[in-house]
Structures are given as C-alpha cells and as structure tokens.
Amino acid sequence: MANKKCPVMHGGATEISMSNMEWWPKALNLDILHQHDSKTNPMGAGFNYREQVKLLDVEALKKDLHALMTDSQPWWPADWGHYGGLMIRLSWHAAGTYRTADGRGGAGRGNQRFAPLNSWPDNVNLDKARRLLWPLKKKYGNKLSWADLIAYAGTIAYESMGLKTFGFAFGREDIWHPEKDIYWGAEKEWLAPSGSEGSRYSGERDLENPLASVMMGLIYVNPEGVDGHPDPLKTANDVRVTFERMAMNDEETVALTAGGHTVGKCHGNGDAELLGPVPEGADVEDQGLGWINKSQRGIGRDTVSSGLEGAWTTHPTQWDNGYFTLLLNHEWQLNKSPAGAWQWEPINIKEEDKPVDVEDLTQRYNPIMTDADMAMKLDPDYQIISARFDKDPEYFSDVFARTWFKLTHRDMGPKTRYIGPDVPAVDLLWQDPVPKGRSDYDVEAVKAQIAASSLSVSDMVTTAWDSARTFRGSDLRGGANGARIRLAPQRDWQANEPERLNRVLAVLEPIAAKSGVSVADVIVLAGNLAVEQAAKAAGFAIKVPFSPGRGDATADMTDVESFHVLEPLHDGYRNWLKKDYAVSAEELMLDQTQLLGLTAQEMTVLLGGMRVLGTNYNGESHGAFTEHQGALTNDFFVNLTDMNNTWQPVSNNLYEISDRETAKLKWTATRVDLVFGSNSILRAYAEVYAQDDNQQKFVEDFVTTWAKVMNSDRFDLD
C-alpha cells in the first residue's frame, strides 16, 4: 500500500495539527492584537487608500455600476434582468453585521470576503454578487476598495430603480484576512435554535450582549419566525431588539424593512439539500464559489438562497410604495415555499397585482411576506408607522434614504473621514459631530498655566486617559476630541470617578476659557505635561507629541442615549472592574486593548507606565510595584519579574506579593497585573522593559503609545 503520509513536516490544513489555543484553551489569546499587521497586507507600507480613493473617477464608476445592474450574465442571470435586489442584499448584509455594544461588524472593512461571513447561511449566493462586481474592482484597482464597492453597489442599485438617495461617502479600507476579535456567539451549529448548546438567549428571551442577530449565521432575525415558528408578534420583539442593537429606532426599523423588501425577491424554488458546500468549504475547482447546485439547474427561477420563494411587491425592480399597498390592504395566510420554508401569501389578490416570473413575464405568482414583514402590520407600534408611510410615499422615501445612508455609514466614524463628491452637507447627530478647534495658539503658554495649577500627575494623567479611552477602533466612536467627558452621560459615569473628575475640570475649564482654546485640547495637554513631569522625575527629559485643534462638542451635538454603550464597565489600565464578570479580568483588558487599536507590546508598556503614575481607580495600590509613585520608571516590570518575590492568591482577583526570604508583604496585585508575568508572550515583553539597559526605551515607548491613544480620534491629522 502506498504511504500517504504528508511528505513535509508542517501542515497546511487545520486537521494536521492542534493549535496552541486548542492545546491550552484557557490561555490568553493575544492573536486579536496581532491581526491586520503589515505582513498580511499586500499593498506595502507606503500605500494610502484614503489618498488613492480621492483619485477615483466617481462619475465613471457610477455609470459602470448603472450599466452592470442590467447586464445579465448567463452564469448567474439577473432576476427580471436587473441585479438591483442582489446588490442591495449584498450591501445590506455587509452593513447589517454592525452592533452598537462594541461597534464591531459593519461594512467598513470588506470583511464579507472572508470567513465566517462569506459562508454564513444568511449570505447564500452573495459570493455571486461579489464576482459580478469583480470586473469593476479589477478596472478601478487600488483607487476602489472592496469595502467601498460593496457598500456603493447597493446605493447605486436603489438609485437605478428610482430612489433619490441621500448620498454616499468613500473611505472604507479593506482588511486582508478574517477578523479574529469579533464574537459571533457560542453556538456549535449554524442556525441553532434557542436553548441549544451555547445559546445566546437566557431568561424569558434575553439576548446575550454584544450580539444583535437572533441566530448563529443570521444577519437579523429568522424570516420564518422565532426559531422557525411563525408568529409575527413574537418576531416583532426579535426585530425590535435586533434593530435597537444596530442603533435603529422603530421608524428606521420599519423604513429599512419596507425599503429593503420593496425591490428584489426571496429564492427558494428548489431543494436546499442539493446545494453544494459553502465557499469556505468548497473544492478548488469551485474557485471560492459556494452553494453550487450540481444536480439541477440552480440559477434564475430555480435559485435557492433563503428558502422562501417570491417577491414582496408587484414591481420588484422599481422603487415605489408597493410594499405597504400589498401588506396593509390584503389578508395573509401561511404557506410553504417549494423549498419547505414558511412564508405568508395573500388570500385574495388581483392577478395584475402579482409579480411576474423572473424569466417568463407572462407568468405571475403570489407575492410573499416574511414573518418580520407581517410584524410591520400586526405589531401596534410598527403598524402606526407603516400606515404613515403608506399615506405619505415621499416621506417614506426620504426616511428610508436617510436610514440607508446611516446603515451603510454607521461604522465609518465622524464626517471628517468621509470622502467623495456625494457626501451630504448636513451634520447628523449619530455622526457624533465635533466642531473644529483652534490650532493657532501658544501651546507652551497654556502648558505653563496647567503646570502652575494644583493638579497632580495622577489627576492629569487619569483625566486625559478617561477622556481618550472611550475610543473604539471598531466603529471609530469615542475618544478625547469633543471633550464629551464634561457632558452627560460621561460626566456621571462611575468609571470616571465623578467627584475627582469635577475637581479636575474645575481647574482645567477656566484655563481653556482664559486661553481661548478647547477643553479637549487642555485635557490632553495636561496629561502630556504630567507624563513629561513623571519622565523627568525618573531622570529622562522627553517631550510628548501634541497636535492642537481638538474641538468641544455641546450637549446639542450629543445623543446621550447612544453614548451609554461607550461607558466603561472595566478598565485594566486603571485596574478596575465595575463588578465580577464571567469573563476573566485579563480577557476584558484584551478586548479593551483591541478596541483601542493597540498591540500586545503597546498594551504592556502602557499598563506598566500607568501603574507607576498612580492612575488606579479610587487610588487603589494594586499593581503599583514601586516606591517612586509619580515617576515614570520601569519598576512595575523590574519587580514583577523579580524571583525574590512570591505570589499568593487571597481572593478571586487579588494576590499578595511577598519577599521570598522574609515572607514580608510587599505589594498586592490583580490578575491583570500578574498576567504580564504569567503569559509567555507578555512576559517576554515585560522582560524587555525590566532590563537594566532599557529604562529609556521604556519611557520612549510609553510616550509613543500614550500619544497614539490621545490622537486615536484625530482623523483630521491623517
């Protein structure tokens, strides 16, 4: 028998060998901090997409996209000769993964090209949509990212079918491998019903945070009903929770549901069991395409995607008010699609009100509604909104256009990041607007006023940190710009120690007013000054980089409700947990670090510096391994790695560090502190900063990382 053993010492497939995380599943997974580095990016260090996209011929692209919509390809024919519905679903399912709790998901990175999204059950046949777009991506090359093209395709699809769109902004940069930091749920199977192993539901029907979709592999809700059981009122509850977690209110929810279903159709005219493997599991000859039906025709009218079959409206390639006309003026009953999926069909309907077949325009079939569509009619609050839209088509079109813009731009950050000729002039509250601040002032003079105040190093560093730490690299919200730390709700957050914060602001705000500069700048400048003072106390003269120009947001520019999701519930850098959580403190710190956009090395040096600067919450001394608090020394690392010490737990998250010889208690520490000595990777970094010859390197690296955090939301500097 031939020896089929792999002829090389390594494996290219996952079944060949176990990963470290499989051998030691409780180990800290630092991979989420190492993703998206230059080694995976084929464009090179000098490539700047945001500059390249400014060279894009937008009008030519728009013309090409309009032409593509009606250029039906025989390998994947367009329904009714128009790809609009398919392209809208592509854009929608890219943007619809966004959730407010952690800002992850969304259309901003082109992540739908990679697993798991490229193979989700809800994304069946969207691989075909991306292949249809490939000639345009190929043509426009580096001037057009996949992320921008996917989002733009849906917008132009609506425009081509008659909707007056609200606008569009370019500037989404592609990633080059799957995102490892996004938690999609703990279920072990696709479309696992409630109560399955790892279920995302508890209690009556409480959806686990930060999740927004109701099932593993769905973008929103189950179109057949809760766990596949039709009941529009129960589905309405799922819809409301899901869309709220995507930052949509009831009116926006109805608009998106109706507008998304005004055009296009569901596909379920066949046997779903005949579909081939998903893209990520398909064989090489399928070239990245999935769900191929090799037993039957499987395209055109015989396509199977969601399993439901039919269009929602009479004219599914035309923007109109037909969705409400049919939904509200007919009685509906449950039927099964050819693929066996539950769907609602009208009991009595005129033949001319039925949509025609996608291939034979002489044949007509019943329109259909999903369980979520029926919720728009039967839920009392949704019904009122639906009736309003039905009576005022222009109002509906305007609300939908604005909401579609919000959906496709929610994770792009502030308006200063928008690029292109079709950027709306209006400022929208959900964009967290911040006015431009002054940059033409004497920075050193302002710094001198701060230095002359009574504020300590701890006060200034802590306040600057608290202001900046809200930044999320996921949806680019938060940060120090705007100084919203002085406004509701942030001023009253427990994490910000309101009493201390108010005392510090009482000193800094008058300095800002007297100098005619923003409070945002003064808060950061004070933090920088404190770091410089601490470095000097450690024997090093260093200047922290500072770029003036931050503005101060007002209460009118701040949607208080939307900022609740940015409230810190933990902060490893200040050694604080609001309460005990099922997730370990070090894992929470890792998540915080990833959202801040920091690497494992930056996390290490930043935390070590914060510990010796006296920034712990409420003045706690845990992890402050130094006798020189307020001086930017490497004492945290020196004492953490000192084998003359022993470490003993005294409670779940508290440890005592004692002298090995005398047993004298020296310090206390938390899990977050000790993980930098226990995790092999973090210990390697800690040892670098503990070295006798790296004290200056520690100071320099801390300053670099500190400045990075302070400027994380300064998109005007890009």
UniProtKB/Swiss-Prot annotation:
Does the entry feature the keyword Metal-binding, yes or no? Answer: yes
Query: Which keywords label this protein?
Result: Heme, Hydrogen peroxide, Iron, Metal-binding, Oxidoreductase, Peroxidase
Instruction: Report the Gene3D superfamilies cross-referenced here.
Output: 1.10.520.10, Peroxidase, domain 2 (1.10.420.10)
**CDD domains with a match to the protein in the record:** catalase_peroxidase_1
**Of which family is this protein a member?**
Belongs to the peroxidase family. Peroxidase/catalase subfamily.
- Enter cross-link residues for Tryptophyl-tyrosyl-methioninium (Tyr-Met) (with W-92): Y220-M246
Query: What's its catalytic activity?
Result: H2O2 + AH2 = A + 2 H2O; 2 H2O2 = O2 + 2 H2O
Q: Where is the signal peptide?
A: none
- Per the UniProt record, the site (Transition state stabilizer) maps to R89
Q: Which InterPro entries match?
A: Catalase_peroxidase, Haem_peroxidase, Haem_peroxidase_sf, Peroxidases_AS
The entry lists its GO molecular-function terms as:
catalase activity; heme binding; metal ion binding
Q: What is its EC number?
A: 1.11.1.21
Quote the NCBIfam families the UniProt record gives: cat_per_HPI, PRK15061.1
**What is the location of the Tryptophyl-tyrosyl-methioninium (Trp-Tyr) (with M-246) cross-link?**
W92-Y220
Set out the biological process GO terms recorded for this chain's protein.
cellular response to hydrogen peroxide; hydrogen peroxide catabolic process
SUPFAM superfamilies referenced in this protein's UniProt entry, alphabetically: Heme-dependent peroxidases
**According to its UniProt record, how is this protein modified after translation?**
Formation of the three residue Trp-Tyr-Met cross-link is important for the catalase, but not the peroxidase activity of the enzyme.
* Role noted for this protein: Bifunctional enzyme with both catalase and broad-spectrum peroxidase activity.
Explain how, and how many, cofactor molecules are bound. Binds 1 heme b (iron(II)-protoporphyrin IX) group per dimer.
Where does it sit, as one GO cellular component term? cytosol
Name used for this protein in its record: Catalase-peroxidase
